[in-house]
Design a protein with these regions (language model features):
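Cysteine-centered iron-sulfur cluster-binding motifs in ferredoxin-type domains/subunits
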Residues: 21-34, 71
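Generic structural signal for beta-strand residues in well-ordered domains
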Residues: 13-15, 24, 58, 85, ...
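Conserved Radical SAM active-site core
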Residues: 2-9, 18-19, 36-93, 98-105
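Surface-exposed, flexible loop/turn segments at secondary-structure boundaries
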Residues: 12, 73, 100, 120, ...
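Short glycine/serine/threonine-biased micro-segments
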Residues: 24, 67-68, 113
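Short, flexible active-site-adjacent loop segments at beta-strand->alpha-helix junctions, enriched
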Residues: 28, 71, 98, 115-118, ...
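N-terminal [4Fe-4S]-dependent radical SAM core
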Residues: 1-23, 36-41, 156-159, 167-176
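Classical nucleotidyltransferase
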Residues: 103-176
Length: 176
């Protein structure tokens, strides 16, 4: 059972998205320099589709849902991502502190962040980071059967580009 203890709408966790970030508790990763150690505890309210529906309704204008954590129960994250995709037009992101899972089903995710936080390497906006931020891309494999396959494109550079541009005051998103 997944629990969460807080939410916030952000503009920087997922590039070019207005994101409702849901902080999942019970994190098993325990990064030594974690800035959210309170999320290690098994606290908060149960996160299930009816709760998620209420959170979405209360946050008009969002374009993306980000599950911040959830490494204690990847199947629950997957099931919630499936619910979001089947019931809304929102994009779905998972911020995981674990390395990329080889058998992670991708069909309900638009973005996936992987890797534990290591202070000496920095976060996503550091060129030395061990963390990676992927956009899940879809490509038609066979036109007649309309078989889609998914692959990951590393877009970590967007966080680094934004940091540099903000430092010099000249940022424009490539997609705009």
């Amino acid at each position: 059972m997944l629990k969460y203890n807080e939410t916030m709408v952000t503009f920087g966790e997922v590039p070019s998205e207005v994101t409702l970030c849901i902080n999942i508790t019970g994190c098993p990763v325990h990064c030594p320099d974690c800035h959210s150690k309170h999320l290690w505890e098994d606290i908060g309210n149960e996160l299930k589709p009816v709760v998620l529906s209420d959170l979405i309704a209360k946050n008009d204008g969002i374009t993306c849902i980000a599950f911040m954590g959830g490494d204690n129960s990847p199947i629950d994250i997957y099931n919630l991502a499936e619910w979001v995709k089947n019931n809304t037009e929102l994009k779905v992101c998972w911020y995981s502190g674990m390395p990329l899972r080889k058998k992670l089903p991708l069909e309900y995710f638009d973005y996936i962040k992987t890797g534990p936080y290591k202070k000496e390497l920095g976060g996503l906006d550091s060129v030395t980071t061990n963390q990676r931020f992927y956009e899940v891309k879809k490509k038609l494999a066979y036109k007649s059967d309309e078989v889609m396959y998914r692959y990951l494109e590393d877009i970590t550079y967007k966080f680094q580009k934004l940091k540099i541009a903000n430092e010099i005051g000249d940022y424009q998103d490539d997609e705009e």
